[in-house]
């Protein structure tokens, strides 16, 4: 850059970005990056898995089986985005992106086993750094006193940062194959 331009930028503490890319391509890349980094963000408890290209956020009370369901999905060839805590960012009016805090990226915690490094155990193709939130599956203990939609006629939604995401409540009973249920829902 011009030496005077550089001097004034330093003098006024203005960041100066340089790249060998064409200015239009570089500007577009910076705008995309800023759009994600400055987007409204919340933390959500659950597991985010990419199932057949759809971002499935599995939620429910602690100990209900979210991580176990995710592990079975990974074993079936799907991809882990994040376990336990998701950082959800609203990057556009209709798009939510989920990612893991750096400290938990690519790890799953299994009660009684400990922490598993999914990337090391299953390979690089078993993980993703970010993923869209397309569907929420809420796991809950089955209750004989509650009526459950057996035909899928009732539409449920969950609201995150003003975005309505399709949702399914799945009652948990011994012997249910949660991975298969998640695949079917996706």
Language model region names:
Residues 33-53:
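P-loop NTPase nucleotide-binding/switch module
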Residues 82-138:
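Conserved nucleotide-sensing/catalytic segment adjacent to the nucleotide-binding pocket
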Residues 52, 90-93, 140, 161:
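Short acidic-glycine loop/turn motifs at beta-strand connectors
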Residues 1-36:
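Feature captures the catalytic cores and cofactor-binding loops of soluble hydro-lyases/lyases
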Residues 31, 43, 59, 181-182, ...:
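Domain-scale detector for complete catalytic domains at protein termini or as standalone homologs
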Residues 53-81:
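Glycine-rich phosphate-binding P-loop
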Residues 130, 134-186:
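Conserved NTP phosphate-binding and transfer environment spanning the P-loop NTPase/kinase superfamily
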